[in-house]
Regions:
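Juxtamembrane intracellular "pre-TM" segments in multi-pass secondary transporters
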Residues: 1-6, 192-226
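C-terminal ends and interior cores of transmembrane alpha-helices
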Residues: 88-103, 296-308
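Short amphipathic helix-loop junctions that connect adjacent transmembrane helices
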Residues: 28-49, 240-256
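Helix-to-loop junctions at the C-terminal end of transmembrane segments
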Residues: 65-78, 271-285
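A late C-terminal transmembrane helix in Major Facilitator Superfamily
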Residues: 343-371
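C-terminal transmembrane helical hairpin of 12-TM major facilitator-type secondary transporters
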Residues: 287-331
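Hydrophobic core of transmembrane alpha-helices in multi-pass small-molecule transporters
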Residues: 17, 93, 105-121, 312-326
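Cytoplasmic helix-loop-helix junction between adjacent transmembrane helices
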Residues: 112-150
């Protein structure tokens, strides 16, 4: 790991941590908040499932627009300034959710979820910053460092949210608000990143769709983005339904589900900190690393649809998350390498918007559980990941530098 990069970009890495930490923090809270009547009678036994679905759906809807917009904005204003906007916006979102509990007003909670989604743009901006800060041959290692930080946040968020929420639902929301506000101040005082505007930015509500439309003029970015979308859709379908399987088929309690999620986080950590570097050295090319990761991850996902028992599912979950890192890091690196330096925020914004869309689709699929067993969706997740190999095969090799 590049310790100097962590030191010089400490505020940025904290922003990445808080983005994923606060995201994971909300899952146990939402389940608890909408488990029964609440919010002064606005949530009832009759509408609680609808309210819970809305609480989950608003974040990815906001993220779909916010990640693309903030990613493009970062190419115009610079990474640091846009990260300040993200953190201040996240603080405002968690402030609204905290206020909703104080006033027993569920629509304030929904507004906070939407604001948090709109401001959840630190990951693509951080990824673009890492690419700017290192040489092309070190790009994958820099992405892996961002993934390590994401993994720590992914493990800490649900655990801390569940513990604090057990005593008072307002505690984790207040913690998220305070940490995001503190990081916004840190970023405002930081000195990394661009200090001048690089190109004009014009606000347009159609911007996320226009950002996708720009792909037609940048064909090199299409293959890695298509592979990334299929890969993420398959994995997030698995992630959504494996929790249902562990609870309904294996009798896991809420605490055990939390520990299961932490185990998945350990897999991400192992993949990022220990496994990615030797695999990268072995396969060398981003395209080959991505294909290896998708083939391994997809095959393991297919096994989860079989009756392997609770212990088998735990082992498979760790291995799946290790393999996930190979494709995740290499595909992000391939996307950033497909455009020039001024458009890396744009392409990373597209990747995060794609993830938001995948989260939304995977969530909608849960409505089919009454008609189909969860194992069907686990198998479908594996098939989707394997389908991602098709576009990955068409990823272009990096262009050789022009000799003077």
């Amino acid at each position: 790991m590049q310790i100097a990069l962590f030191r010089s970009h400490g505020a940025l890495f904290l922003a990445v941590f808080l983005d994923i930490f606060s995201f994971g923090l909300m899952y146990p809270l939402i389940v608890g908040l909408f488990d029964g009547p609440g919010f002064g009678g606005q949530v009832t036994l009759a509408n609680r499932d609808l309210m819970m679905s809305l609480a989950f759906a608003l974040f990815p809807i906001g993220a779909f627009f916010g990640c693309a917009l903030l990613g493009d904005l970062s190419d115009a204003l610079g990474r640091r300034r846009t990260l300040v906007v993200c953190m201040a916006g996240l603080a405002a979102g968690y402030g609204l959710m905290w206020l909703s509990l104080e006033l027993a007003h569920v629509w304030l909670f929904f507004a906070g979820r939407m604001v948090a989604g709109l401001m959840s743009g630190t990951a693509p901006i951080a990824q673009a910053s890492m690419v700017d800060a290192v040489a092309p041959e070190a790009r994958g290692d820099a992405m892996a460092q961002v993934t390590v930080v994401n993994t720590v946040g992914l493990m800490a968020g649900p655990a801390i949210g569940g513990v604090l929420g057990h005593y008072d639902f307002r505690l984790p929301l207040g913690l998220a608000l305070a940490l995001c506000a503190f990081n916004a101040v840190m970023l405002a005082r930081a000195r990394f990143g661009e200090e001048t505007r690089r190109r004009a930015f014009h606000f347009d509500w159609r911007q996320p769709f226009l950002l996708f439309a720009r792909l037609k003029d940048r064909p090199r970015a299409i293959a890695p983005l298509a592979s990334f979308f299929l890969f993420q859709l398959g994995f997030l379908t698995y992630y959504t339904f494996i929790l249902v399987v562990m609870q309904r088929d294996h009798g896991f309690s809420t605490a055990q589900i939390g520990l299961f999620s932490v185990g998945m986080g350990v897999g991400f950590m192992l993949g990022s900190a220990l496994c990615y570097a030797p695999v990268s050295k072995w396969l060398k090319e981003e395209r080959r690393i991505a294909i290896f990761g998708e083939a391994t991850c997809g095959g393991l996902l297919l096994l989860t649809a079989l009756p392997v028992g609770a212990a088998g599912q735990v082992v498979l979950a760790v291995l799946i998350c290790i393999a996930n890192v190979f494709s995740y890091v290499s595909l992000l690196s391939a996307m950033s390498g497909a455009v020039d330096e001024t458009e890396r925020g744009w392409v990373m914004g597209l990747s995060s918007a794609s993830v938001a869309l995948c989260v939304f689709i995977a969530g909608l699929l849960t409505s089919l559980l009454a008609a189909l067993p969860a194992a069907v969706f686990l198998g479908a997740g594996g098939v989707l990941v394997l389908l991602g190999i098709g576009p990955a095969l068409r990823i272009a090799a990096p262009e050789a530098p022009v000799q003077a």
